[in-house]
Amino acid sequence: MAQGTVKWFNAEKGFGFITPDDSDGDVFVHYSEIQTGGFKTLDENARVQFEIGQGAKGPQATGVTLV
């Protein structure tokens, strides 16, 4: 399981990007992959843990949880 920092997240559009600790490229994150109750959003610079899958346009975070 990878860890990283939320680069940005737009709650209105429901997506953003995470910068993994062990990679140069950012990873797309969709609100549906955030594993929290209630309103699913991420704060900028929040520490997260996630799996990396392959989306239609590149790497995508799955199973995202706050660290």
Swiss-Prot record:
Predominant cellular place of this UniProt entry's protein: cytoplasm
Protein's cellular compartments: Cytoplasm
GO cellular component, one term: cytoplasm
Gene Ontology MF terms: DNA binding
Gene3D superfamilies linked to this entry: Nucleic acid-binding proteins
Pfam family, one: CSD
CSD domain residues: 4-64
SMART domains xrefs: CSP
Conditions for induction: In response to low temperature.
Superkingdom to which the source organism belongs: Bacteria
This protein's record includes keyword Transcription regulation: yes
Matches recorded under PANTHER family: COLD SHOCK DOMAIN CONTAINING PROTEINS (PTHR11544)
Protein's name in the database: Cold shock protein
Gene: csp
